[in-house]
From Swiss-Prot:
PANTHER family associated with the record: 40S RIBOSOMAL PROTEIN S14/30S RIBOSOMAL PROTEIN S11
CC terms in the record's Gene Ontology section: chloroplast; ribonucleoprotein complex; ribosome
Main location: plastid
Protein name: Small ribosomal subunit protein uS11c
């Protein structure tokens, strides 16, 4: 029986990305942080749930900060230096996630709120009676 010859291939090199976009989705229940390059290819992502927070703790500002730090640490391997920040949602973790980006040494060049606002579109759900 013939033995298989293995091909020796080079490891795919990591592409260098200096400028990127950070998308922060802050809901009342969780915070998601996604870092991509300018064309939209995702480099790194994290969420409060992926960082080990469960239940009501996922919606806290500290959980958002932890998720943001973890995503930035992954993205720094690609040589990321400057980012535009797009924030969506009404959650508690909006400001803390942006602050965590700045603390880890990323240059924030732009902060834009991209929360969708209806121009009186769909009828909202009925009011809660507690």
């Amino acid at each position: 029986m013939a033995t298989k010859q293995r091909k020796v291939t080079q490891k795919k090199s990591r592409r260098k990305v200096q400028r990127g976009v950070v998308h922060i989705l802050a809901t009342f229940n969780n915070t998601l942080v996604t870092i991509s390059d300018r064309s939209g290819l995702v480099i790194a992502s994290s969420s409060a749930g992926a960082c080990g927070f469960r239940g009501a703790r996922k919606g806290t500002p500290f959980a958002a900060q932890t998720a943001s730090e973890e995503a930035v640490r992954k993205a720094l391997d690609y040589g990321l230096k400057y980012v535009d920040v797009m924030v969506k949602g009404p959650g508690a973790g909006r400001e803390m996630a942006i602050r965590a980006l700045q603390q880890l040494g990323l240059g924030v060049t732009l902060i834009r709120d991209v929360t969708p606002l209806p121009h009186n579109g769909c009828r909202p759900p009925k009011k809660r009676r507690v």
